[in-house]
Amino acid sequence: VDARSAALVRANFRSVIEAPNGSERLVSAFYGHLFAENPQLRELFPPAMDMQAKRIVTAIQYVLDHLEDWGRAQKFLEQLARDHRKYGVDAAHYDAAGRALLSAFRAYNGAAWHRGLEEGWRDITILISASMAIGANSDKSQPFWEATVVGHRRVLEDLAIVRLQSESPIPYQAGQYVPLTVPQRPKMWRYFSPAIPANPYGEIEFHIRKIRGGWVSPAIVNETRVGDRWQIAGPLGGLHVDRESGRDVLMIGAGTGIAPLRAQLIEMGQRGINPRVHFFIGGRYPCDLYDVENMWQLSQSNPWLTIVPVCEQKTNPWWYPHPPQEEPYGMHRRLIGNLGAVVASFGAWADRQIQIAGSAKMIADTRRALIAVGTPEHIISSDPV
């Protein structure tokens, strides 16, 4: 894709996502064309397609952001195709998906469509469909594993820690996330990061918070029972500590976003030599730092790890039923303020490799705060959310 075409499709896509209901209209047109041409594909997907719409827009944006670094975009698309194997989608379906996506952009733009957009989006959709077909063909492993719930602990009213055991180990790396579906909401795949590294016993743990208005997370927190069988698909994402870089590490996690960072730290604790790590754990209230004591205990036996708790509010909300928890002796005092602003107040951290995990807003705000004080953008890593 040449520079002119890249600029043209980026501007066009920006006009789509900035328009009222633009993303929803585009994705609705995409699925309309896809299922009209391939009605057998409809039964592979859940009845509610709202999350699919968000993922499609996020994926297109990622590709457009990395056209000049196509190797990175291709790796992302191949991984995305491997993920779609859980639906029963295979390599043969991606040509149809590419045609449907081009038709969706053509229909959305209407009279504003012209030859330059046709050629630019045609090239982009061909690249996307070809890369995803390669990804689908490259993975011969099983599309998902079954795991049994062996523990469900309600840490807060809206947060649960769920432990499961699969019959065989699930091959993920600490820091990755996995799609899963639960019996209470079949076919509704959602993405969560394991909070512990993979082990040979098939044990896996998730920290899950209810999303207001969500379908799956409230069912997991409120309705999960020991003995439930979950399906867990292959891993995605690339958060990791680069041990060859020679750089120390800054980790910034909020709420259940600590899970992928926590898993990496536990795995690092099993090694003899590690880079220094500063781990800022954030939450709105002190009670949101539900795992800070466990992380503090980990730091006690691993002197390379420093834990720094951060809260927006000094005290718990009035409805929280438990007395204030005493901070472990010797832990860094709790800092008060916005997590990103607090971290940025210490400087640019330009000599670190930086990972951010949390909500989309938290990641964006923290990234912006760091860049504003001089942090090089290329040293900051986060997963698309």
How should each PLM-predicted stretch be described?
Residues 1-145:
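Core of compact, soluble alpha-helical bundle domains
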Residues 16, 276-385:
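Reductase modules of NAD(P)H-dependent flavoproteins
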Residues 141-229, 247, 283-284, 310-314:
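Ferredoxin-reductase
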Residues 175, 257, 359:
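Short, conserved phosphate/pyrophosphate- and ester-handling motifs at nucleotide-, phospho-/glycolipid
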Residues 234-246:
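A short, basic/flexible loop-to-alpha-helix module at the beginning of a structural domain
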Residues 249-250, 355:
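Conserved beta-strand elements of the Class I
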Residues 260-270:
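Histidine-anchored nucleotide/phosphate-binding helix
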